[in-house]
Amino acid sequence: MESSISQTLSKLSDPTTSLVIVVSLFIFISFITRRRRPPYPPGPRGWPIIGNMLMMDQLTHRGLANLAKKYGGLCHLRMGFLHMYAVSSPEVARQVLQVQDSVFSNRPATIAISYLTYDRADMAFAHYGPFWRQMRKVCVMKVFSRKRAESWASVRDEVDKMVRSVSCNVGKPINVGEQIFALTRNITYRAAFGSACEKGQDEFIRILQEFSKLFGAFNVADFIPYFGWIDPQGINKRLVKARNDLDGFIDDIIDEHMKKKENQNAVDDGDVVDTDMVDDLLAFYSEEAKLVSETADLQNSIKLTRDNIKAIIMDVMFGGTETVASAIEWALTELLRSPEDLKRVQQELAEVVGLDRRVEESDIEKLTYLKCTLKETLRMHPPIPLLLHETAEDTSIDGFFIPKKSRVMINAFAIGRDPTSWTDPDTFRPSRFLEPGVPDFKGSNFEFIPFGSGRRSCPGMQLGLYALDLAVAHILHCFTWKLPDGMKPSELDMNDVFGLTAPKATRLFAVPTTRLICAL
């Protein structure tokens, strides 16, 4: 008996035998664990290790909408070691954004996003928690408020500048898309750095474009972390250069603003001084960020570092430039494709405003059909088609398992075109928003969420809508538009390009004719 026991112990001490036992136990425990947890949602079958990475080109708003037709409103994919979920129905969106809002309130971040936002020092990609809550409070009250937006002369000034530019090209085809992008770029740049600041704008736009490319670049290390130290695509070098360029540019601007503030304090004559976004954020500046009680006075409850200020500025530049420009261009494109709706909007402008003056802010709320047109544009072409979230803990939806740190993509594009929520969802029909009970985009109707909903809804919604309303109203009131070279409305290119936003694949060209009898 003792001999048998000693032989058994001798076998167990053998490394190979021990390894087999450990692996067997691991497989057994994994099997038991999997049997106890709910199943994953349906989705396309993946390969070992790489999962569904061969389907990367289908992870667009349109590609995921097509997958939803086969697998339903909650679809599971595995990209390397990362679990990904596509949400394409209002019912599942409600679970994510309302019922389990706290579980899904984190933001996923790629290697590029983490590095370029100074390790999530911004608001857009910071994880949900005390730091994020107070950062959002600062931004909503000081940066993104409607009152603050209306006080920014840059919006009105840049719209006026665009109108004058268009009026110089009456009767000729113009690149409307370029005009609009220049408008939103100038608005956000001046709002961030000062109404008289044009120095280095081209350099900053170059940096912004490189950031955009890096944010959207495929990096295999995001899905298989072991490749991170190899950097087979050379992305790490580009990341370092891009952030160094940004540091050099914005550090100079911050230094200039701090010197200006010191000089103003030294010669305080009581005059009210116009402030920009950098000034607003510098009011909270400290060498080290510090959090106190969330009920404390705002000025004392959070201190921002330079990294925080730079990261927030990049949030605003991305959120306020491409998203608003895309919405304006899509609105004009859809109206040129639907002449009857264009005629109705311009008739309303003539009746409410008159042809003897320009549109003023006080007119906007009276332009009911214009508002319907912009809502329909946001339904069909949401500024950010995929809203990204990350789970803070293991959870389940409709009996399906969603593990911690899963990436959840809420497809605002697919939800806005859900045939169970919208009649003729692929048809541009602004009049649908005149009907009683139609969903609104403020975040409580999950059939229509162009700005998200819940804790992580877009804090810049009011500012974006203000610029959208004002720009489209002026463009349509000041000018009559037609397509160039005898092009028919049905011939307009309605394809988009997927990225952080989904702008038109080709720029809109149109011919303006002066409409007003007053000076432009």
From Swiss-Prot:
Main location: membrane
Keywords, comma-separated and alphabetical: Acetylation, Heme, Iron, Membrane, Metal-binding, Monooxygenase, Oxidoreductase, Transmembrane, Transmembrane helix
Membrane-spanning segments: 12-32
Membrane topology: Single-pass membrane protein
Top enzyme class: oxidoreductase
Annotated residues for binding of heme: 458
Residues recorded as bearing N-acetylmethionine in the entry: 1
CDD domains cross-referenced by the UniProt entry: CYP71-like
Pfam families: p450
Cofactor(s) the record lists: heme
Keyword Acetylation annotated: yes
Subcellular location(s) of the protein: Membrane
InterPro entries per record: CYP450_84A (IPR053062), Cyt_P450 (IPR001128), Cyt_P450_CS (IPR017972), Cyt_P450_E_grp-I (IPR002401), Cyt_P450_sf (IPR036396)
Family designation: Belongs to the cytochrome P450 family.
Stated name of the protein: Cytochrome P450 84A1
Gene of this entry: CYP84A1
